[in-house]
Swiss-Prot record:
One of its GO terms (biological process) is tetrahydrofolate interconversion. SUPFAM superfamilies: Aminoacid dehydrogenase-like, N-terminal domain, NAD(P)-binding Rossmann-fold domains. Homodimer. CDD domains: NAD_bind_m-THF_DH_Cyclohyd. It comes from Methanosarcina mazei (strain ATCC BAA-159 / DSM 3647 / Goe1 / Go1 / JCM 11833 / OCM 88). One of its GO terms (molecular function) is methylenetetrahydrofolate dehydrogenase (NADP+) activity. The gene is folD. Pathway: One-carbon metabolism; tetrahydrofolate interconversion. This is Bifunctional protein FolD. NADP(+) binds at G171, H172, S173, I196, I237. Belongs to the tetrahydrofolate dehydrogenase/cyclohydrolase family.
């Protein structure tokens, strides 16, 4: 059981997500009343993976809360890459669809990179298209990956100084690690990117003022690996029979952190909320 004295150190992703959703709802209402446009999100799901279905449902519920029109496009698992690309092309040309989300992972015979590159950069709600990634690398942040965007929002809301601080990212994926590094560099942090193969990971994490962990390894980060007062974002998630765990040993690390996200209820809700914000951005830019 967590000591009540530590509760003020928890970054409540659900509360932050509600704030973002309220902003999006207001923006959606403005678009509808002033321009007669309802932002629309198309979600593409290939196959019947239970986890993917659950994630799509979560996103559709968020759409309902903010007034975004969501439509699901289902393809059987034995569909071809060509059929997927044809669907994406039709959605690119559908003026009622402002954002497109391709739910990953895809069945093994698909090329996810080719499919993501087929999505119009203007409708790339996930922020994964190389065009949008390239803009991020030169400091032009528009449609960026949702999880790093959520982390930045949390840093801003909690007034965490970033400029000149040591930021360490554990994980170098295209979804979190690499864009997270770019966004922190854009704010003049001194950034180190590590991963599960890094020699002496502890040497790096001990120096982190801001630590973002997205390695997908249960309790990879222990209390002796972080310094007093660090701000920690746990992006990892591991599901086991007895519960859901993050990459950070939360109950022990919170005793040293100044701020920390829990799993669940931390970065996850913020990620979905930022997706809603991106769909609104896509709709506004389509005018």
């Amino acid at each position: 059981m967590l000591d009540e004295s530590y509760e003020s150190r928890i970054i409540d992703g659900k509360v932050l997500a509600q704030q973002v959703e309220e902003e999006v709802r207001s923006g959606v209402e403005d678009l509808e009343s002033n321009r007669g446009i309802t932002p629309g999100l198309a979600t593409i799901l290939v196959g019947d993976d239970p986890a993917s279905k659950m994630y799509v449902r979560l996103k559709h519920r968020a759409c309902e809360r903010v007034g975004i029109r969501a439509e699901d496009f289902l393809l059987p698992a034995d569909s071809t890459q060509e059929e997927l690309l044809a669907l994406i092309d039709s959605l690119n040309n559908n003026k009622d669809v402002h954002g497109i989300l391709l739910q990953l992972p895809l069945p093994e015979h698909f090329s996810p990179q080719e499919a993501m590159e087929a999505i119009s950069p203007a409708k790339d709600a996930d922020g994964f298209h190389p065009y949008n990634m390239g803009k991020l690398m030169i400091g032009d942040e528009g449609l960026v990956p949702c999880t790093p965007h959520g982390v930045i929002r949390a840093l801003e809301e909690y007034n965490v100084p970033v400029k000149g601080k040591n930021a360490v990212i554990v994980g170098h994926s295209n979804v979190v690690g690499k864009p997270m590094a770019a966004m922190l560099l854009n704010r003049n942090a001194s950034v180190s990117v590590c991963h599960i193969f890094t020699d002496d990971l502890k040497k790096y994490t001990l120096g982190a003022d801001i630590l973002v962990v997205a390695a997908g390894v249960k309790h990879l980060i222990k209390a002796d690996m972080v310094k007093e007062g660090a701000v920690i974002f746990d992006v990892g998630i591991t599901k086991e029979e007895d519960g859901v765990y993050g990459d950070v040993d939360f109950e022990n690390v919170i005793k040293k952190a100044s701020l920390i996200t829990p799993v669940p209820g931390g970065v996850g809700p913020l990620t979905v909320a930022m997706l809603m914000k991106h769909v609104l951005m896509c709709a506004e830019k389509s005018l």
